[in-house]
């Protein structure tokens, strides 16, 4: 089957939140079982160096929906009234659009990330949607302290260690209240999202019209509550563990608070949850195949970011996104694309950013070069003329080897980084001196609050004192800072980073 844009009618975009790239078999992990995603990778194009330019959850969605960088402009904030989204462009073009999701940050008051979709189906109860179940009485048999480690909560005198302790128990209590009626594996959040997706594909959509479907699963984001936790069984990836299942841990550095054995168990639960997500995504892919849609549908599967979970390469000493640190385990993401007529089984090593995904979708739909205008009915229409991404189609078709020489990543107002074939460089912005040196974007009026960069009270704005340089070939997970030994290379990359950020500020 040769590539022909006119034969591609539909797009299915699947976002899996907090899925670390190297926890997938197709990205080299030999422990985690992900057969469905691995099969999809073999039949699709896999991108080995995809990076989220501005993290975490919300700025990634904004970049993907608008085709424009969020770094360095803004962070955790609503869609702007002047943002042109994919659905804005598709409006009036005889293409039905649907959003099926449980990612509650997209649904925060006035955030507007469901804007423009014809059909919206939200599954309540995930993180930041606690109010849905706040009046639900908790089964007395379910105690929050039974789903974490006591030494993370209380000191030797039986007192709370700090303010993180009651917050952790409250957070676990919220999740228990939401999931206490869970009886089967179909009651998990990812199952609900994928089952509702199947229902829309089979029963609700207009089968005479093309469609754009955005599926957004918050799983495998924490809580780490895979099937074994609810069944009261050992985790298959850690059957010898004898403590409480650790559904959640505090937003803290792990040293002195979370043991390495506990970190191992957390990672095992995370792996099990990924395997569960893989199974349900597999069912959605099977549904697409069974309905004969795969030969006329572009399918994208990716994540917004990974997850720090321990020391060294597992998280640089932190748990969850408790610090604004743009290291490899967080900003390097999995990305796979199936495009009918494009050779499957390819692995592309060129750098890719979120905005390139959006540009590719528009290119496949033959809308990348469209401009704002007026329809035949006198209504304003929108185009992709302001996109900052590059289509990946030329690489996938073998016309070019790469579209970028580097990638950028970071947290709004706190950290920037640049990644090249040989090096990665991290520049910290928090101190006033560093802000001045880097000509940092202030933009206080363009973000909800710097304290809300994860929208979690436990997160702290703490960064290292010095910029960092890493040899990607010898040290891919950025454990040995060589900036002092290589000041010229560090300065070269800093200047390159400042130039890139400066160019983004003016476009």
Stretches with model-predicted labels:
Residues 1-507:
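Catalytic domains that recognize anionic headgroups
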């Amino acid at each position: 089957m040769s590539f022909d844009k006119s034969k591609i009618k539909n797009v299915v975009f699947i976002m899996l939140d907090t899925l670390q790239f190297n926890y997938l078999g197709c990205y080299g992990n030999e422990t985690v079982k992900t057969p469905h995603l691995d099969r999809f990778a073999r039949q699709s194009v896999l991108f080995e160096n995809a990076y989220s330019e501005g993290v975490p959850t919300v700025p990634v969605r904004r970049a993907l929906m608008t085709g424009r960088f969020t770094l360095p402009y803004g962070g955790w904030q609503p869609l702007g009234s002047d943002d042109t989204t994919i659905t804005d462009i598709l409006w009036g073009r005889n293409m039905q659009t649907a959003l099926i999701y449980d990612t509650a940050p997209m649904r925060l008051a006035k955030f507007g990330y469901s804007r423009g979709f014809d059909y919206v189906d939200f599954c309540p109860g995930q993180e930041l949607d606690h109010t849905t179940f706040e009046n639900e009485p908790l089964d007395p048999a379910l105690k929050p302290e039974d789903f974490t480690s006591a030494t993370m909560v209380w000191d030797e005198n039986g007192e709370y260690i700090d303010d993180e302790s009651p917050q952790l128990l409250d957070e676990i209590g919220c999740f228990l209240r939401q999931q206490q009626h869970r009886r089967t594996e179909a009651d998990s959040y990812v199952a609900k999202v994928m089952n509702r997706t199947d229902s829309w594909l089979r029963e609700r959509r207009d089968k005479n019209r093309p469609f754009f479907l955005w599926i957004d699963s918050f799983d495998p984001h924490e809580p780490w509550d895979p099937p074994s936790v609810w069944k009261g069984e050992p985790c298959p990836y850690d059957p010898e563990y004898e403590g409480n299942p650790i559904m959640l841990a505090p937003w803290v550095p792990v040293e002195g608070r979370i043991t390495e054995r506990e970190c191992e168990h957390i990672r095992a639960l995370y792996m099990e949850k990924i395997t569960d997500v893989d199974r349900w995504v597999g069912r959605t892919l099977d549904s697409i195949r069974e309905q004969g849609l795969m030969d006329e549908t572009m399918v994208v599967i990716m994540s917004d970011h990974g997850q720090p979970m321990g020391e060294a390469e597992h998280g640089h000493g932190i748990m969850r996104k408790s610090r604004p640190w743009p290291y490899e385990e967080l900003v390097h993401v999995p990305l796979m694309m199936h495009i009918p007529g494009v050779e499957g089984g390819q692995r592309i090593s060129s750098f890719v950013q979120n905005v390139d995904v959006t540009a590719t979708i528009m290119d496949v739909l033959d809308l990348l070069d469209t401009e704002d205008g007026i329809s035949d009915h006198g209504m304003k229409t929108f185009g992709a003329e302001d996109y900052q991404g590059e289509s990946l189609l030329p690489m996938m078709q073998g016309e070019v080897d790469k579209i970028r020489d580097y990638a950028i990543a970071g947290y709004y107002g706190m950290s920037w980084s640049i990644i090249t074939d040989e090096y990665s460089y991290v520049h910290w912005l928090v101190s006033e001196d560093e802000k001045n040196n880097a000509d940092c974007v202030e933009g206080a009026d363009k973000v909800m609050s710097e304290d809300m960069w994860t929208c979690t009270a436990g997160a702290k704005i703490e960064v290292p004192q010095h910029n960092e340089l890493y040899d990607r070939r010898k040290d891919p997970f950025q454990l040995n800072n060589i900036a002092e030994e290589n000041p010229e290379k560090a300065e070269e990359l800093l200047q390159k980073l400042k130039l890139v950020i400066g160019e983004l500020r003016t476009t």
